[in-house]
């Protein structure tokens, strides 16, 4: 059995969070470019392990398949020694698990509406679609404000070093104007995200995905 993780993802996508976690912990892995918007990518290979063709999709060393960013990060955190991606303290760990569910449920889901507003209304004219996007973006930014108020840094959300929740927040907050909004309305949390971005163990991955 190989000890290598196989990650299906694409540049600038949510797979960056999983890639960052694997890289930060020096876990052997290989990234395969695959996405429905990249027709020349390894879509058939992705479809074979995940019929939904969603990324990230992670094939574990034992051959089992994991999907959903939060589920993958939780499993990696449980697999590694306590205190690495998830805190060792049970109460702190419970809050990090809460945050890992909060982001997909309240933030990631809103981004999908902003990206594809035509899926969420019968009114297909441009004005109606823009109204859906604007309303959803406002709600998304409010959800991030609530997140910032609920999850204190110590100095990072996960403790002394960036953990799973720090990584996921740093990735998902890059979309839909969230960083600019947080810089104005939650500057301390915005500063935390920048610290995660520039952390030496994560910076190479984020640079690969966002050229910054």
Language-model segments: what does each one mean?
Residues 77-81, 152, 197-198:
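Residues at helix-coil transition
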Residues 77, 172-173, 206:
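Active-site-flanking alpha-helical
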Residues 36-37, 162, 211:
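Positions that flank functional sites
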Residues 1-128:
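GST-like domain detector, emphasizing the conserved glutathione-binding G-site
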Residues 188-212:
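Long hydrophobic alpha-helical segments typical of transmembrane helices together
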Residues 99, 103-195:
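GST-like fold's C-terminal all-alpha helical module
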């Amino acid at each position: 059995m190989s000890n290598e993780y196989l990650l299906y993802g694409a540049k600038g996508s949510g797979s960056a969070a999983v890639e960052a976690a694997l890289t930060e912990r020096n876990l052997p892995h290989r990234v395969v470019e695959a996405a429905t918007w990249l027709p020349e990518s390894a879509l058939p290979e992705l479809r074979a392990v995940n019929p939904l063709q969603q990324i990230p999709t992670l094939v574990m060393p034992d051959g089992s398949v994991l999907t959903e960013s939060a589920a993958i990060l939780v499993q990696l955190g449980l697999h590694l020694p306590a205190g690495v991606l998830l805190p060792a303290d049970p109460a702190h760990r419970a809050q990090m698990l809460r945050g890992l569910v909060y982001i997909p449920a309240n933030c990631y889901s809103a981004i999908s509406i902003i990206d594809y507003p035509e899926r969420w209304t019968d009114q297909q004219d441009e004005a109606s679609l823009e109204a859906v996007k604007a309303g959803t973006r406002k709600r998304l930014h409010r959800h991030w404000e609530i997140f910032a108020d609920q999850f204190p840094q110590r100095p990072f959300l996960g403790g002394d070093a960036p953990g799973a929740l720090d990584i996921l927040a740093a990735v998902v907050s890059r979309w839909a104007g969230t960083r600019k909004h947080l810089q104005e309305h939650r500057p301390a949390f915005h500063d935390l995200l920048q610290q995660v971005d520039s952390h030496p163990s994560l910076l190479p991955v984020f640079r690969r995905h966002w050229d910054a």
